[in-house]
Amino acid sequence: MDVQGVPRKVSAITATLLAVLGFLLYLRDRAADHEPYDGPLASPGATGARSPGGTRRIALNTEPSDYPRLKELGYDLVDVKADASLVAGVPQGMQGLLWVGNFTCDDFELGFEEFQRAVQRFGRDPKVYGWYLSDEPNPGECPEIANEIRRRAAYVERHAPGQISFISLTDWPMKPLTPERVGVDLYGLDPYPCRGSSKARERCDIGAIDRMVRMADTAGIPRARVAPVLQTFGQSCSSGDKQYWLPTEDQFREILARWDRLAPRPPLEISYSWGRQDKWACPTLSDATGGPHPDLQSLMKARNRSR
């Protein structure tokens, strides 16, 4: 045995352990930095006529094998890529929201010419509900993203009659992305109020929903175009961030009640997420059947089938 190498190996192991410990402390401190919103609440949404066709419902990050269970829970939309075999696999009684977008400032799933071909192919397909053009675009960091969304939304409007364009927003600048500026039909708002730890705490920051709705109001996004994004994920088993926990059943009821106050008859309602995402979402709604996790599936089934 080469004893001369032992101190060097021990030092390397120690350095590795310290690095791992530092990363875990960073994640803990990052989560602990979250301050609950204590500003003004958003005004209640109008309780006017229900959207034509009622509220459509989708749980994101699904596979074809999930469709029977999703349909049983009352979801009528699935997210798929603009692929002929995937679109053809959308079950009867459901439609697809086609993911063709980008995340924040990243490249788009499809270049513009490829996007045009996809719209030409699926723009009149009855299995297609609409087009998911961007996930959390950040015009503060990449101002050009607004122009790209605008030309894609305009192309959908011209060549996909009856189908919708959709983007999902977070708490980044919204004003460059309003319907008046980019022509998008529907806007997901994704405040995730159960934040600050990957382990469940007594309270979620329900006011975060009001904060983001007020941001959208101020920017000029009409409530009638808002699609609530419901938090159906945590991060206790994710490999990346540890900032969010899966809401308890009572906390989830509180989330639903707040959204019902602010957007009582939305055209679209989104559950994020059904499927696990290694870095960002674990556990998710697919896990939330009771036992070790809250039974959020039963709550969503009752909600989806009653509205």
Region roles according to the model:
Residues 26-34:
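Hydrophobic single-pass membrane-insertion segments
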Residues 9, 35-307:
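Glycan-processing catalytic domains of CAZymes
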Residues 5, 25-27, 47:
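Intrinsically disordered, low-complexity regions enriched in serine, threonine, proline
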Residues 13-25:
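Hydrophobic membrane-insertion alpha-helices, especially the h-region
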